[in-house]
Regions:
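Transmembrane-cytosolic junction motif
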Residues: 24-50
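Short, strongly hydrophobic alpha-helical membrane anchors
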Residues: 1-13
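Hydrophobic H-region at the start of alpha-helical membrane spans
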Residues: 15-23
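Charged, low-complexity intrinsically disordered regions
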Residues: 42-249
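N-terminal functional modules and adjacent low-complexity/disordered segments of proteins
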Residues: 1-4, 28-30, 115
Length: 249
């Protein structure tokens, strides 16, 4: 409501307006909390059906392992929740929801020469992750993104690693990381063929963890399918640790 219009209201009317706004704000907050709790309850039911352990709160042990992955170094006010875990034939599979907030400057030309806080906008980004911790497994830190997805890491100078003998993989994905030689040793034909079966794969990996990232929170009816596909896909990395040439000292 415009300030001039508020100034024309009587004190009693203004009081009702303020109370109304406060009530609506409070209701919105309560509804948000309710839906968050309801989603956690629904995910716990799914986890129980699959024989998975569930926690609505973050797994600090796993989160500590992921701190060096690109996504987990972005933004501020990050949050890991609704963690589902189980041991599979490939390793410890974890599925969880993750979000972070990021404040960006508006790109409109009229804002570029100012520093007013109104020139900035904070956005919250939501993701669904599946991670696989593989015993006796060690890999270089790397990220794989679908081709055409430019991000901060590449824009800051890191180069896409290509394989001339596997054009399907190189033309479909961006692969990058600090240890190019180690990454080239790690990626064999079998692994690149695995990516050819999942062209939208967005993967971050390092040490004994491989993570598959999806944008947004998944629909409840899609969770079971995602878990099964993630375990199969991430399990395809396990063979790489069998080759001594792929091991880092």
């Amino acid at each position: 409501m415009p300030v001039l219009l508020l100034a024309q209201l009587s004190p009693s009317t203004l009081q009702y307006v303020i109370l109304g706004v406060a009530a609506l704000t409070g209701l919105a907050v309560l509804m948000h909390i309710y839906f968050q709790m309801k989603r956690s309850e629904d995910l716990e039911v799914i986890a129980t059906e699959l024989g998975m352990a569930f926690s609505a709160k973050e797994d600090s042990r796993l989160l500590n392992k992921l701190q060096f992955f690109p996504t987990f170094r972005l933004g501020h006010t990050s949050n890991m929740k609704n963690v589902m875990q189980m041991a599979t034939e490939h390793g410890l599979l974890s599925v969880f929801e993750y979000s972070y907030s990021k404040t960006d400057r508006l790109t409109d030309q009229k804002y570029l020469a100012t520093t007013d806080r109104r020139d900035f906008k904070t956005r919250t980004y939501h993701f669904t992750f599946a991670t696989l911790e593989i015993p006796e497994f060690l890999c270089p830190h790397f990220s794989v993104r679908p081709q055409g997805f430019m991000d901060e890491t590449l824009s800051n100078g890191m180069q896409d690693i290509n394989f001339p003998y596997h054009p399907v993989f190189s033309n479909s994905f961006l692969l990058y990381g600090q240890d190019e030689q180690g990454i080239r040793h790690f990626f064999d034909n079998e692994l690149m063929n695995l990516f050819a079966t999942k062209r939208n794969a967005y993967v971050e990996a390092g040490n004994d963890v491989v993570a598959l990232r999806l944008k947004g929170r998944q629909k409840l009816e899609d969770i079971k399918k995602f878990i099964a596909e993630a375990d199969e896909f991430l399990g395809g990395f396990k063979h790489c640790s069998a080759d001594p040439a792929n091991q880092l000292v």
